[in-house]
């Protein structure tokens, strides 16, 4: 009994399990279909949306492309029309301007031609001129206006009186006149008359004055050039003479400047000059005595005598370092060979060398006066040098400040 009950329970349990599995399978299948349907619907929507979006973009792009092309075509068409219209306008203006210019020229030429004819007709109408031949003119007039006289039309009239007369505008009779054409195509009487020729001559003179001014300038230039060419020799001779006079004046001035005595760097008083001459003469005597003595000693060897017996008779001024303040003036005898080219030389009245100043002392001795003092106790040379800045108490040495 228990077994039967157990089998029955197991069968029912098995049926329930089968139903449950079946339901689960159906649910799974149904769910799969639902998911698939949802995906399909969603995919369709996505595809449709994408197509719609793409179609919209394509439509928009096409519209943009067409609009751009249309805008470009419109611009091109507009530009072409504008360019064409401008060209047409310009061509029309050019055509109208050319026509206007041509018409104006034609109009002015016609007016000018008409006015000239009217002028000639009035002259013929109011001036009855007797026919004349070339023999009635002077030779000079025929020479100048021979070509023009042949072009003049003369009208012959006879009056009751045997005298030949001409009728004027105001119906007055005046004496016979002879007319010719001038360079400006105007009638001018050969015999001047104020009533006829004043107006014509005034107009012609105003036009000729401008030409005359230019001709006067050109003729003046030609006269000057011709004068210079014809009188070239006279002009050059005058210039050379003037140049010689100026050169002589310049030479005189230069010679006067050279003749002016150059001021020495050191001014020597008369007492100092006499004392320097005495010292130089004493030195020469001593040198001569020494020379005579050396002749007896150096008679056999002349080279030794020449080296020992050099003539040192020139007095030279220089500075030496001595004393408590630095420098002192000093003199020494040298020969002419020892004079340096940059040394300063002072001459006496007879152009003999009186004193030579060393090249290193020149800057410090400028404007110095050399004097000589002598009394019963002392005799000495005194230097009054403005360049010295300090002197020692004993007066033997001095000092210069450094120049900046």
Swiss-Prot record:
Coiled coil start-end: 244-289
Pathway: Cofactor biosynthesis; iron-sulfur cluster biosynthesis
Xref: Pfam families: Fe-S_biosyn (PF01521)
The keyword Phosphoprotein belongs to this UniProt entry's keyword annotation: no
GO molecular function annotations of the record: 2 iron, 2 sulfur cluster binding
Subcellular location: Mitochondrion
Gene Ontology CC: one annotated term: mitochondrion
Gene Ontology terms: biological process: iron-sulfur cluster assembly
Chief site of localization: mitochondrion
Keyword annotations from UniProtKB, A to Z: 4Fe-4S, Coiled coil, Iron, Iron-sulfur, Metal-binding, Mitochondrion
InterPro entries the UniProt entry points to: Fe-S_cluster_asmbl/transfer, FeS_biogenesis, FeS_cluster_insertion, FeS_cluster_insertion_CS, HesB-like_dom_sf
Function noted in UniProt: Participates in iron-sulfur cluster formation (ISC) pathway for iron-sulfur (Fe-S) cluster biogenesis. Can bind and transfer [4Fe-4S] clusters to target apo-proteins.
Self-association and partners: Dimer. Homotetramer. Interacts with ABCB6.
Family: Belongs to the HesB/IscA family.
PANTHER family: IRON-SULFUR CLUSTER ASSEMBLY 1 HOMOLOG, MITOCHONDRIAL, IRON-SULFUR CLUSTER ASSEMBLY PROTEIN
The protein, known as: Iron-sulfur assembly protein IscA2
Organism: Plasmodium falciparum (isolate 3D7)
Recorded name of the encoding gene: IscA2
